[in-house]
Amino acid sequence: MLSNTLRSNFLKFYANRHHTIVSSSPVFPHNDPSILFTNAGMNQFKDIFLNKETVSYSRATTSQKCIRAGGKHNDLDNVGHTSRHLTFFEMLGNFSFGDYFKEQAIAFAWEVSLSVFNFDPDRIYATVHEKDDEAFALWEQHLPSERIFRLTDKDNFWSMAETGPCGYCSELLFDRGESFGTATSPLEDSEGERFLEYWNLVFMEFNRSAEGSLLALPNKHVDTGAGLERLVSIISGTNTVFEADVLRLLISKTETLSGEKYHADEPLGAAFRVIADHVRSLSFAIVDGLIPGNTERGYVLRKILRRSVNYGKRLGFTQPFLAEIVPALVDAMGEAYPELRLSVSQIQEVMTIEEENYFKSLHRGGNLLQQVLKSSSSSSTISGEDAFKLKDTYGLPLDEIALLAKDYNFSVDLDTFYQLEKEAKERSRKNVIKSHNATDTVYDALSLGENSTFVGYHDLSCDTFIEAIIKNGEQVSYLKEKEKGILILKETPFYAEKGGQVGDSGEIFCSDGTFIVSHTTSPKAGMVIHHGEVSQGQLHSAQAVTAQVHCLRRKNISNNHTGCHLLHKALEMTLGDHIRQAGSFVDDTKIRLDFTHPKAIAPEDLASIELLVNEKIRENHRVETREAAYSDVMNSKEIKQFFGDKYSDVVRVVSAGFSHELCGGTHADFTGDLGYFRILKEHAVATGIRRIEAVTGKEAEVLARQDNQDLNEIALILQSPRDQILNKLQNILDEKKEQTKLISDLENKLIYSLLDKVIDRCQQIEDVSYFIYHLPESESHRLQQYANCLHQKIPVRLVSLWTTQKNGKYIIFSRISDDLVKQGLKAKDLLQVLLTPCGGRWGGKDIFAQGSADSLPQADILNNTLCQWISTQLI
């Protein structure tokens, strides 16, 4: 694969020039709710640019996995219809954090263009900002001035946000030749097909104030990004990014599965392109811990998958197919991203389940669309509200709604539809940035000399100083008795909630007062904030205090965290290597672990997992921790790491017997400290994600005692020895089964007895025999039984039965034979006709349906309505 070679050579080039190769962060930022997905190489370095985070290196290079399918950068609707738009792509980049600047960045870019990309220097062009004389002069060392163009802020000025770091940028373009257009310069190439941009160099040298003025940054940074797929296309000489390398391989696989051939210029070409791109986005998102859902990132992922299915239908796919393309992706990219190989079954399972659900939803949506068409017959227009519901709730594409509407000479109220869609997108955007705005402001404004130093791995108490006090979102100088607030300390033994471990509680005190810490969090890297209330006296900023963690609670939390690690390893050993942690929570009372697994765990496997964890507890292994360079452990098969997580260059390895994980949490000293481990329950939390809840120590002992007590009480109730309880229960169930059958037989005899009395009420219209009858109130729970018996006894082809409940409401049931359904008669349509005039409700399937109403017309009116409906349907 050319992409593998190009990626490797690019990273090696910069590594040989003192750049640290930094692994790609996940496709969604864990600690930045302001953006839906990682959409550029600089995202994972954002806090470095903002001086919120420090790292040991000043130069970095990456190949970053990116998704642009939501928020400000959203290419979803363009994918498949242009030559280069993608939702998933890789961005090659090099970064300088206060190290080199324009001169070196431009020199590197030129050298890479010639020696790594092997571009003809006579076909390279550059753009700079109209005010950036320095960059223009530097490019003149490599290019003639007539191939360097000055552009405005619109094209050559970059900013992270409305305020903050920003600067001029310089773009590199490659002339693909006259076959891609007649333009003679980038300025004439409005479509950008001949002179294709392949690299953007951003020079962060300013800080934009709230007033809009540009101030010089004390440290100047470089951020560059080059799209790997675009580079591969240029080097391969293909017309589009889809005709080379990985994407072409995925298109070929789709050709094999569909039996159709890919032709770029034909209408079906878009379907191939959409599927190839979307399979990559879905696969990497699932690997990094995302699953399709109804909100935020999960909702976007669901849209991507459903869009794939919609285009797949054009190629003839009528059942799940995306999972069959995944192995081709793994073959192409598994070497560069080994997490793909480890998660193949998980990716395929999530895709297949989601596709199955969507195909069912499409079927329901199609039926609903038919109802909408009937209910809208007076206006010949499908309302924007109905169209939006069909798309948003049932996933029916707008173009499919419009096509079906056209078949019936209907139109769609597109203005209202697009307005509702716009409002939905705006709500989604506000939800994404809401938590970001609410949590960052006050902490970003603090001027602290140093971040809080955590000493709590070994010390649960320390003498320290109060560095800041926050009350009601504002920094204050003191807190009085009974006032709630937040303390920030210079050193702290309190562990802040993160990595699934709950924060510590305890006390912060001095001779002047005591602050009860209820919980501890970390709003940004390096900062620990203590939430609580002054119980007596008062506390001031800069005051010397003693910080004391609640020791027993910490011990129980630490034991449970170690238990979580043991459980994770036991799951992997029992169920397989596909097990990956998808989330966790540990406090002083319980363990909750979410993990990837396609189905419920068998009881015998749960028992094996529990036994294995308890075996490691009895072996009483020392729990050991050590720090290591991430580069030394990142490829270790023994040490568990989570592909959705971002790691610093120095990591902490926690080893507990057979378990080895990268973890920053607190742990037991020995596995034996856990005492005993019990699983409470196992259940699904999302498609392909299971959850186990468990307890250790005292909580596990309490559970065991309760189980023992329950068994004794059950034995007493059953009047059976404990070792005979199961046999006794089985005998009771067998007896109940026999009694139920006897009751059912008697009920059927009663039903047939009643039917013998009313059999002469069966009526006929043409060749359709039908039966409509009012049953006594006592028979309301057996409407369906009566209808089925009528079909068997006469057999009658259409039945409608109704009765009155004790609350005065009417219940009506209709059943239609299979052969009538094939002729177009549907039970739910009949109930719609019978119940609409009286404001009733109904639901069901084509063969049988049930409804209710507060009132019904007289029997003869119902009979006439039914006759008219049958006659109309048979025309």
UniProtKB/Swiss-Prot annotation:
One of its GO terms (cellular component) is cytosol. One of its GO terms (molecular function) is aminoacyl-tRNA deacylase activity. GO terms for biological process: alanyl-tRNA aminoacylation. It catalyses: tRNA(Ala) + L-alanine + ATP = L-alanyl-tRNA(Ala) + AMP + diphosphate. The gene is alaS. Zn(2+) binds at residues 561, 565, 663, 667. Its main location: cytoplasm. It is an enzyme of class 6 (ligase). Catalyzes the attachment of alanine to tRNA(Ala) in a two-step reaction: alanine is first activated by ATP to form Ala-AMP and then transferred to the acceptor end of tRNA(Ala). Also edits incorrectly charged Ser-tRNA(Ala) and Gly-tRNA(Ala) via its editing domain. It comes from Chlamydia abortus (strain DSM 27085 / S26/3) (Chlamydophila abortus). Keywords: Aminoacyl-tRNA synthetase, ATP-binding, Cytoplasm, Ligase, Metal-binding, Nucleotide-binding, Protein biosynthesis, RNA-binding, tRNA-binding, Zinc. This is Alanine--tRNA ligase. Its cofactor is Zn(2+). Its EC number is 6.1.1.7.
